[in-house]
Design a protein with these regions (language model features):
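Short, charge-patterned binding micro-sites
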Residues: 36
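Phosphate-binding/catalytic loop of phosphoryl-transfer enzymes
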Residues: 40-139
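Short, small-residue-enriched loops and turns at beta-alpha junctions
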Residues: 4, 39-43, 111, 158-161
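ATP-binding/phosphotransfer module of carbohydrate and carboxylate kinases, centering on a glycine-rich
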Residues: 1-33, 51-55, 75-82, 123-253
Length: 253
């Protein structure tokens, strides 16, 4: 549920129809709700989300924050550190144990999002169409995904959510990571993520860099290699924030 893409009424309707039926018996007992989501970028948006939740779950405490803060809390708890998201998109921050103190804007998959699924997929598709990979590998890719040049162009430029389409082909990379050309593609994108994002945080060399998301999780070995190449150290890598968030919200403040 992206808070920027939906009105308060649309969010309230979705919560009422998709969430509440699953937790109906618990709603009267709920005293606190912590919601982390994409698009929760300012107080106005967060207030709209809180009201949408309150319409179905009238808890005394409703806290709304970004998915990046969720990553920081899940990865670092109440300790300072660098927290990153590497999934379809990418993001990062310096977190002081309470709040996000610095954030290099990810800029999305056109201008940024280095190391993300969308960008890895974009590079892969471009390399296939421009014959930058071995011929046998290009043919294998096109056959595996039943794609051709015009289909790729249509999916990227004309159909909605081109970024998700590009991210959807990244399993090919991990399946063929032993191929030197594929390994270099992934390694260079991860290096770019560290150089263009992490190395901008003051004192970054004092902290390990922690990650959440499917790309970080499945490509952890190449990610660690990229980090070492630019003088960084990878710390915790998890696929999902839920366990870490439960642990965080169970801690005494």
């Amino acid at each position: 549920m992206n808070a920027i893409m939906l009105t308060q009424e649309e969010m309230a309707a979705r919560i009422a129809t998709e969430l509440v039926p699953e937790i109906k018996q618990y709603v009267p007992k709920v005293t606190s709700v912590y919601f982390y989501g994409a698009g929760c970028i300012n107080e106005e948006v967060c207030a709209n989300v809180a009201e949408a939740i309150r319409a179905s779950v009238p808890a005394p405490v409703i806290e709304v924050a970004t998915d990046l803060l969720a990553a920081a809390r899940a990865l670092c708890g109440r300790s300072a550190g660098i927290a990153c998201i590497l999934g379809t998109g990418s993001n990062s921050c310096y977190y002081d144990g309470e709040k996000i103190c610095d954030n290099v804007s990810p800029l999305g998959y056109i201008l940024g999002d280095e190391g993300s699924g969308a960008v890895l997929g974009k590079i892969l598709l471009g390399d296939v169409l421009k014959n930058q990979l071995p011929k046998a590998l290009c043919e294998k890719f096109l056959k595996q995904y039943d794609l051709d040049r015009m289909t790729i162009i249509r999916r990227v430029y004309k159909e909605p959510q081109g970024n998700r389409f590009m991210a959807s082909v990244t399993p090919f990379l991990i399946q063929n990571i032993e191929e030197p050309s594929i390994h270099s593609l992934v390694l260079n994108s991860f290096k770019s993520f560290f150089v263009r994002n992490i190395c901008q945080y003051k004192g970054h060399e004092k902290f390990s860099v922690n990650f959440i998301g499917s790309i970080a999780y499945y490509y952890r070995d190449v990610l660690a290699e990229a980090a070492a190449a630019v003088g960084c150290t990878v710390g915790t890598i998890i696929k999902s924030p839920m366990e870490g968030l439960i642990r965080f919200h169970s801690m005494p403040a």
